[in-house]
Structures are given as C-alpha cells and as structure tokens.
C-alpha cells in the first residue's frame, strides 16, 4: 500500500515484484555511476587548461568508448530479459480467474468453479466506513489463495483498460477482442490495492482493484459459500 510522499516502490509481495525491485536498484546504480563519471569529466574539462589540438586520431579511446557502453547495455539487458520470461511463464496454475474491464468497473469469473462470478464496483465516498480508503475500496473483493500460482486472463468489453496492482508487480492491458494473461502469486496474506492504469473515459479514476490473499483453507470455505 502506498503512503503520502512515498519515494520508493511499494513493498514487494510477490517473487516477480521482488525481482523488479532488485532490477530497479541494479539499473539505478548503473545510471548513478554513469552520471557521476560524466559530471566528473565535465568538471575536469572546465577546470583544466590542457588541450590536445594536434590529436587527430585515437583508436584506443574510440575502442574503449565503444566496448564499454556495449558491456553496460548487456549488464542491463540480461536481467531484464530474465524477468520478462519469468513474467510470461505460467506453469500449472492452481486457479484461473477471468477479468473483464468495463466502463467503469471490473467483473471477475473463477473459471474452475461453476457460477462463481461477480462485478466489482468502487464504493462511493459517502458510503465508506471508518478506516476504509477513498477511491480504493470496492463492494466485492477478489479473494485468492496465497502462495499458489494463479493465472489471470484479462480482457475488456468496451475500451482499453489496464489491470494493475503495484505491490504484486502486475500491470496488464485489457484490450477488447484480445485475451492477455498474467501470473498472480503472493508470499503473504493481506489486502492489496490497484487501479485501472489506462485512461478509459470520464470515470477512469473510479475503477479500483482490491485483491485479498488468504490461506488456501479459508479460500476453499469462501468458494463454497459463494457457490
């Protein structure tokens, strides 16, 4: 859950988000080192009186500043590709949930169960209970079992939407006529908030997403009560 004036990323709840956080730190450190080197060279050029007016060719220098950026790009690309493959890989999901975007609410269908589906609307501000979050609470939360791989099939009934839950490292476009998929897996129980992250009309800001991750036994009891 984000908090006011937060500078960093939200606390990672899934293995994917942990990898994304590590990759962010890895890339940020490379950018910091490059920026420091550039600032140092600029300050050196401004402060020194030494010039090389007679230098017409420098093969060694050109070789270094060609090979070094290539190595840096490889250091960024390899972990990035690894995470991309991890995000696309879904092996033997324990549960499949179909998510449909509408103007302006979400609908969910648990495809492994008969007649287990519902719509999820934002709770208006005047109906919120003490302690509930404005513009983030919904009337029907998505209940999922923790510590199990879950496949989300995401699409849209009308316009472009985007199903995003930052603490789980999820952001998948909901496109009419196209079925995208994402993997959901939580390391711990809790309630995790997200929002539609694609401008989809006048009420775009009123499409929150709430996932409630619970132990498997409690999820089974909930699914029986909903069927």
From Swiss-Prot:
- Parts of the chain on the Mitochondrial matrix side: 46-59
Tell me the residue numbers annotated for binding Mg(2+).
Answer: 198
> Where does it reside?
Mitochondrion inner membrane
Class of the enzyme per the UniProt entry, highest EC level: translocase
Cofactor(s), names only, from the UniProt record: Cu cation
- Show the Pfam families listed in the entry: COX2, COX2_TM
Q: Where is Cu cation A2 annotated to bind?
A: 196, 198, 200, 204
Task: List the Mitochondrial intermembrane topological domains.
Answer: 1-14, 88-227
EC number(s) per entry? 7.1.1.9
Query: Self-association or partners: how does it assemble?
Result: Component of the cytochrome c oxidase (complex IV, CIV), a multisubunit enzyme composed of 14 subunits. The complex is composed of a catalytic core of 3 subunits MT-CO1, MT-CO2 and MT-CO3, encoded in the mitochondrial DNA, and 11 supernumerary subunits COX4I, COX5A, COX5B, COX6A, COX6B, COX6C, COX7A, COX7B, COX7C, COX8 and NDUFA4, which are encoded in the nuclear genome.
Say what the protein does.
Answer: Component of the cytochrome c oxidase, the last enzyme in the mitochondrial electron transport chain which drives oxidative phosphorylation. The respiratory chain contains 3 multisubunit complexes succinate dehydrogenase (complex II, CII), ubiquinol-cytochrome c oxidoreductase (cytochrome b-c1 complex, complex III, CIII) and cytochrome c oxidase (complex IV, CIV), that cooperate to transfer electrons derived from NADH and succinate to molecular oxygen, creating an electrochemical gradient over the inner membrane that drives transmembrane transport and the ATP synthase.
Report the protein name in the record. Cytochrome c oxidase subunit 2
The opening ranks of the lineage are: Eukaryota, Metazoa, Chordata, Craniata, Vertebrata
Gene encoding the protein: MT-CO2
């Amino acid at each position: 859950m984000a908090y006011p004036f937060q500078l960093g990323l939200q606390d990672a709840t899934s293995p994917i988000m942990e990898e994304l956080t590590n990759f962010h730190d890895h890339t940020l450190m490379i950018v910091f080192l490059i920026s420091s080197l550039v600032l140092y060279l600029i300050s050196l050029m401004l402060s020194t009186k030494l010039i090389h007016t007679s230098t017409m060719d420098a093969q060694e220098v050109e070789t270094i500043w060609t090979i070094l950026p290539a190595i840096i790009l490889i250091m960024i690309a390899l972990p990035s590709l690894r995470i991309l493959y991890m995000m696309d890989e879904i092996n033997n999901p324990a549960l499949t949930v179909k998510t449909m975007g509408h103007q302006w609410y979400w609908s969910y269908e648990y495809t492994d169960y008969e007649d287990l589906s519902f719509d999820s609307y934002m709770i208006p501000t005047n109906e919120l209970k003490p302690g509930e979050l404005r513009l983030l609470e919904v009337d029907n939360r998505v209940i999922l079992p923790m510590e199990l791989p879950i496949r989300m099939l995401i699409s849209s009934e009308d316009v472009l939407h985007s199903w995003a839950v930052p603490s789980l490292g999820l952001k998948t476009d909901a496109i009419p006529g196209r079925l995208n998929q994402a993997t959901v897996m939580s390391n711990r129980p809790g309630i995790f908030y997200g929002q539609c992250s694609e401008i989809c009309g006048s009420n775009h800001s009123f499409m929150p997403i709430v996932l409630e991750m619970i132990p498997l036994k409690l999820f089974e009891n909930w699914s029986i009560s909903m069927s």
